[in-house]
Curated annotation (Swiss-Prot):
Belongs to the DAPG/phloretin hydrolase family. Zn(2+) binds at H129, E160, H270, E274. This is 2,4-diacetylphloroglucinol hydrolase. It catalyses: 2,4-diacetylphloroglucinol + H2O = 2-acetylphloroglucinol + acetate. Hydrolase that specifically degrades the potent antimicrobial compound 2,4-diacetylphloroglucinol (DAPG) to equimolar amounts of mildly toxic monoacetylphloroglucinol (MAPG) and acetate. Changing Y229A: 15-fold decrease in catalytic efficiency. InterPro entries: DAPG_hydrolase (IPR041526). Homodimer. The gene is phlG. Its EC number is 3.7.1.24. Its cofactor is Zn(2+). The lineage of its organism: Bacteria, Pseudomonadati, Pseudomonadota, Gammaproteobacteria, Pseudomonadales. GO terms for molecular function: hydrolase activity; metal ion binding.
Length: 294
């Protein structure tokens, strides 16, 4: 199994500290309450990469079709963490997380199971997550459908803190090909699944302001999740209807260049915390509450 030096992550903004206490009280009588844990551990190597400051632009990817398909190239290995401000302006975040003892089935199950109750969502990031209901919840729970049929074309309505900013987002999960990933390359890369999406601000769901790519793949000792986030304006986002309005909408909501760079940093920290925390308990949670059909 991959050897990693994990370290406690201990700084959370005051609003997040207060949210933790509310979440702790809400989950107390749930059968899965023991998985609500205050300690969050992250790879020290990922922390150190983020501490180096914004990445050089030549080391980043844009949301263009050409660049996102680089994630599928046989010799491509993602960096563990990092963030930058791209021209546009656009916030950029990259990461690669290891889930020891986890399978693709466990990870898929999590995306079916957690939206049913807000308290389940809080297990994922107790200091940051509020709720994440699914628009088409009956389809999400329909065991006669495949995972892809249940998730793609479905929308999660996430409320969560990113840093000290409470964000209300619509996450519209899409087929990989709909986002620009090449079907042949995807198959050749032997990706076990994708939970990739377009994101919008909840009060403007018709304007995608973000492309989020999450690709997961099993390895002998667990699973790797490779992720990219792009938030903001970029010419290549024009392939998504409504994205041409993203720049003005974000500016109206207080996201200038400085704010987007801060958001990139905070998203990098958020991603590092939530997915490494999920990795710490998902196999045990699945063994207790998961079913093969889900």
């Amino acid at each position: 199994m991959e050897a990693r030096n994990m370290t406690p992550f201990t700084y959370f903004s005051l609003p997040m500290q207060k949210l933790f206490l509310r979440n702790q009280a809400a989950v107390r009588n749930k059968p899965y309450a023991k998985y609500f844990r205050s300690e969050m551990r992250v790879p020290l190597s990922a922390v150190r990469k983020i501490q180096q400051g914004p990445m050089a632009l030549e080391d980043t990817l844009t949301p263009s079709i050409e660049d996102i398909n680089r994630l599928l190239e046989p010799d491509f290995v993602s960096e563990e963490s990092g963030y930058a401000l791209l021209p546009g302006p656009m916030a950029y975040v990259q990461s690669r997380k290891f889930f020891p003892g986890c399978t693709a089935q466990m990870f898929k199950w999590w995306f079916i199971w957690h939206p049913a109750e807000s308290e389940r969502y809080t297990l994922w990031f107790p200091y940051a997550h509020v709720s994440n209901p699914c628009v088409h919840h009956q389809r999400l729970r329909d065991e006669s459908l495949s995972f892809e049929e249940r998730l793609y074309g479905n929308t999660f309505c996430a409320s969560e803190y990113v840093g000290d900013r409470l964000m209300h987002l619509h996450i519209d999960f899409q087929q990989p090909a709909s986002l620009g990933l090449n079907t042949d390359l995807y198959r050749e890369a032997k990706i076990d699944g994708s939970v990739s999406a377009l994101m919008s601000l909840a009060d403007h769901p018709e304007v995608p302001v973000s492309l989020m790519v999450h690709l997961f793949k099993e390895v002998p000792d667990g699973m790797y999740l490779t992720s990219r986030y792009w938030v903001g304006a970029h010419p290549s986002m024009a392939r998504f209807p409504g994205a041409e309005k993203a720049a003005s909408l974000l500016k109206e909501n207080g996201f200038g260049e400085a704010e987007l760079e801060t958001l990139a940093y905070e998203f990098a920290v958020h991603d590092m915390c939530e997915f490494n925390h999920l990795a710490s308990f998902l196999p045990d949670l699945y063994r207790e509450f998961g079913t093969p059909a889900a």
